[in-house]
């Protein structure tokens, strides 16, 4: 059951989430500088901006953020928080949105290797990534999941719930 509206995020969880965002943003800046000759992302590029769901913690933080009204909504699959192909919640965007455009490294435990997911506008399919080029999200996702569990426990909702961005 989803309480409507979702209860506010306690300050301790909000502060820890802010620290998580800062840590991720620092790494993103480092990787973006390292890969700047490949990154084509710029304001107005919304190729990666799709309609998806987020954890209750991030949904609550986004819902409490000031944002301009959305004047135009893209297609059925495009993120509803875009206005003229620009993010209306850019400063408060979820973690997954912050990582778009960079090469994401995932540990494939079955095959004991690292799989890479990268924007085709930035990197060719056979781009020779080095380990230091990759954004490894597992440590950040573990922290996000722990914060979400703490919030959901206090809010009395299921931690595995996913909510659409609106």
Located regions from the model:
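Short loop/turn segments that flank or connect secondary-structure elements
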Residues: 1-43, 47, 53-166
């Amino acid at each position: 059951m989803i309480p409507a509206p979702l209860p506010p995020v306690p300050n301790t969880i909000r502060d820890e989430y802010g620290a998580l965002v800062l840590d991720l943003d620092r790494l993103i800046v480092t990787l973006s500088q390292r890969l700047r000759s490949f990154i084509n992302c710029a304001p107005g590029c919304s190729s990666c901006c799709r309609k998806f769901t987020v954890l209750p913690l991030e949904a609550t933080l986004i819902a409490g953020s000031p944002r301009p009204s959305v004047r135009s909504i893209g297609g059925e699959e495009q993120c509803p928080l875009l206005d003229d192909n620009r993010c209306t919640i850019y400063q408060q965007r979820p973690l997954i949105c912050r990582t778009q455009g960079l090469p994401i490294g995932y540990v494939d435990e079955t095959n004991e290797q690292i799989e890479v997911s990268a924007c085709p506008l930035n990197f060719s399919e056979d781009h020779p990534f080095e380990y230091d080029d990759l954004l490894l999200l597992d440590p950040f996702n573990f922290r996000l999941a722990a914060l979400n569990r703490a919030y959901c426990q206090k809010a009395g909702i299921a931690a595995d719930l996913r909510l659409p961005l609106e």
